[in-house]
């Protein structure tokens, strides 16, 4: 061949992951408290829901007794119905919204449905909290990262977050390398140990 044929190599997409440490998240919540979206931040960090799903949440989708919020397929990015397990913190946030609006759970300071997060308030809160390079969607990344770091499997994370495929949550796998320890131990006796221990392992 005079020339080497060009072959397109498949590159797996690795989306940007930016997540907060718990103390950073608490700092953000504290500075946001004067604004209506402090509860939105808390709710997002405890459910992993996308902004549109949080803002569009209606009272008829919430079952406080069963501690679940239901979303229809046409409301979800993956096109599949999702039942969101609500922890006690998320339940407390929802209860604080009681009586503000007959249809929507979350409203602004005028008790009107929220169509979008006020970017000025959001940027001001980030600046006051000393947080850089962070978007609202990164609250979802933070939620997922915290779960994986605490031992939740990627399969369960996929189900909880409503991702369409397991490949979509592989981006978080590096946050929980504990399962690789037993494989790393294989090489521990080859170098860097004293002569007595090496001899003992050979025998």
Language-model regions, residue ranges each:
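Catalytic-site neighborhood detector that most strongly recognizes the C-terminal catalytic loop/helix
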Residues: 11, 19, 70-79, 91, ...
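Short, polar N-cap/turn motifs at the start of nucleic acid-interacting alpha helices
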Residues: 61-68, 132-133, 152-171, 182, ...
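Short beta-strand segments
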Residues: 8, 42-44, 70-72, 86, ...
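C-terminal secondary-structure termini that scaffold catalytic or DNA-interacting sites
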Residues: 30, 66, 96, 108-110, ...
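C-terminal catalytic core of tyrosine-transesterase DNA break-rejoin enzymes
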Residues: 42, 46-53, 140-164, 171, ...
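Mobile genetic element proteins and their domesticated derivatives, centered on retroelements
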Residues: 21, 28, 122, 169-172
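Active-site/catalytic core of tyrosine-dependent DNA strand-transfer enzymes
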Residues: 66, 75, 87-132, 203
């Amino acid at each position: 061949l005079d020339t080497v044929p060009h072959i397109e190599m498949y590159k797996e997409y690795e989306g940007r992951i930016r997540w907060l440490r718990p103390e950073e998240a608490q700092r953000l919540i504290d500075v946001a408290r004067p604004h209506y979206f402090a509860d939105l931040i808390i709710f997002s960090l405890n459910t992993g829901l996308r902004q549109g799903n949080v803002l569009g949440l209606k009272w008829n989708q919430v079952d406080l007794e069963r501690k679940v919020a239901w979303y229809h397929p046409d409301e979800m990015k993956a096109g599949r119905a999702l039942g969101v397990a609500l922890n006690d913190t998320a339940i407390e946030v929802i209860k604080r919204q009681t009586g503000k609006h007959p249809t929507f759970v979350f409203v602004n300071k005028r008790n009107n449905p929220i169509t979008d997060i006020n970017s000025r308030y959001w940027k001001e809160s980030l600046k006051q909290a000393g947080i850089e390079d962070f978007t609202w969607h990164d609250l979802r990344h933070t939620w997922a990262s915290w779960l994986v770091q605490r031992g939740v499997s990627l399969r369960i994370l996929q189900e909880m977050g409503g991702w369409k495929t397991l490949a979509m949550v592989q981006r978080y796998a590096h946050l929980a390398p504990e399962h690789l320890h037993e494989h790393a131990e294989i090489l521990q006796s080859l170098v860097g140990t004293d002569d007595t221990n090496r001899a003992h392992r050979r025998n």
